[in-house]
Amino acid sequence: MVSYNESIYYDRAFHSQDIAGSIAWARANHKGGILSAAEFSAIESGLEKVEKEWAAGTFKIIPGVDEDIHTANERRLGELIGKEIGGKLHTGRSRNEQVATDMRMWLRDELRKIETYLSDFLRVIAARAEKEVDYVMPGYTHLQRAQPIRWSHWMLSYGMAFASDLERLREVIARVNLSPLGCGALAGNPFNIDRQMMAKELGFEGLLWNSMAAVSSRDFVVEALQWGATLMGHMSRWAEDLIIYRYFLFL
């Protein structure tokens, strides 16, 4: 059952987001009077050391002990600064909100990378279409020559598809980039923690206002996957056209 319940070998991908969220949480608990300045400083510096271990590839996962990325980071923090102070990090926080926060931050960060790649790709398409506007080629329907077209016209037909993908991606990112931190297990936080401050520190654009929905919903993951399927459908068409056009019969 221990091995069955472990998710550390999957959610360790969230290590940076988990640590950033924990630092923001500790800062908010310090502001709320739960942690002293010295305790917050120790927790912050300890978590920064844990992040350096992950970055250097020296963090040691302990099978059977580190159930998930949250327990792994907190276990290591306690080893570095002592369990008495390290154990205070989790005061008032639930892993329900913690994993939802990690997932949203990680997904947002990865989608923004794709956003950059897709924007660059669109610029290349536009530049090539402008440069090669005088190239003429056969236009095909059902693999039969139908009408003469410009190479740039073909290029920009995919440019429109990818531009729509980019627009939809930005809409997905906007819905992903909302903070559940401070929502507790399902009914909020009893210590009047500053959710706005934490959201701003972690780069969220706003808050999820219903605590039960915030910690239980995973529709943002499904929406990102749906978007990715649409993008790959366009990429597949693009690739298939290029494969077909490499044969002399089609040029």
Question: Which residues fall in each region the model found?
Answer:
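Acidic, glycine-rich loop-and-beta core segments that form the ion-binding/anion-interacting portion
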Residues: L202-L251
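A helix-coil-helix interface module used to build multimeric assemblies
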Residues: M1-G188, I193-K200
